[in-house]
Amino acid sequence: MFVHPQFDPVAVSLGPLSIRWYGLMYLIGFAAAWLLGRYRASRPGSGWTPLQVDDLVTYMVLGVVVGGRLGYMLFYDLPAFLANPLSLVQVWQGGMSFHGGFLGVLAVVWFFGRKTGKGFWGVADFTAPLAPFGLFAGRIGNFINGELWGKATDLPWGVVFPDPRAGGVPRHPSQLYEALLEGAALFLIVWLYSSKKRQSGAVSGVFCVCYGLFRFAVELVRLPDPQLGYLAFGWLTMGQLLSLPVIVFGLWLLARRAPDQNASQ
């Protein structure tokens, strides 16, 4: 059993400016994605320039932040949004949704593909290996904040979180499970898969299937958002429900892009 260290929510203070851990983790995730994107662009035959990566990551930041916040309010806290629409811009109060951010990124991919002539899948497959860095950093931010914990457990790595709502009992550190699976493991899988030429959309398909399965599995030991609870069967969460179409979409991509077709990465 471990006791959560109860970090100061403010990571850095520069006079009147305070940077919270969650925001810092997002910054680290985007910076890592940018560096990896530039590395991929530098490889011979990539078809990408460093400037294009700079532009893409800039648009991605907007897509993730706007989509993630809007998705959270619509999927997880709709009554609060309807009661106070201005809560949408109160990002400092927390509340970001991967699935909303995913939709925001899809919009960016479509726009950037048209803008550069690379096409939707050309941009999507290039972007897929970059995304796990942000997912990893975001989940570490959740753990530092002591939020989104799991169910009670007697496993030796259970963590006692400081929030009184956690009941003072050891719980699954579901944030770390997600960081390892949706971040580290997903990066390794997608990176290795993308190291060889694949059919258009295949890399994106692997990303969607693996992310959806990892998220669905961890949600089994993670407590649902208190304002929603379980949606059905005493275990189905909103995160699982939203992950199902992501998995189906990924499977469709892999089935649609047959291995014997011409590679177009």
UniProtKB/Swiss-Prot annotation:
Pfam families: LGT (PF01790). Keywords: Cell inner membrane, Cell membrane, Membrane, Transferase, Transmembrane, Transmembrane helix. One of its GO terms (molecular function) is phosphatidylglycerol-prolipoprotein diacylglyceryl transferase activity. It is found in: Cell inner membrane. Signal peptide: none annotated. A 1,2-diacyl-sn-glycero-3-phospho-(1'-sn-glycerol) binds at residue 139. Its EC number is 2.5.1.145. It is a multi-pass membrane protein. The chain crosses the membrane at residues 17-37, 56-76, 92-112, 117-137, 173-193, 201-221, 235-255. One of its GO terms (cellular component) is plasma membrane. Pathway: Protein modification; lipoprotein biosynthesis (diacylglyceryl transfer). Belongs to the Lgt family. Catalyzes the transfer of the diacylglyceryl group from phosphatidylglycerol to the sulfhydryl group of the N-terminal cysteine of a prolipoprotein, the first step in the formation of mature lipoproteins. This is Phosphatidylglycerol--prolipoprotein diacylglyceryl transferase. It comes from Solidesulfovibrio magneticus (strain ATCC 700980 / DSM 13731 / RS-1) (Desulfovibrio magneticus). The lineage of its organism: Bacteria, Pseudomonadati, Thermodesulfobacteriota, Desulfovibrionia, Desulfovibrionales. The gene is lgt.
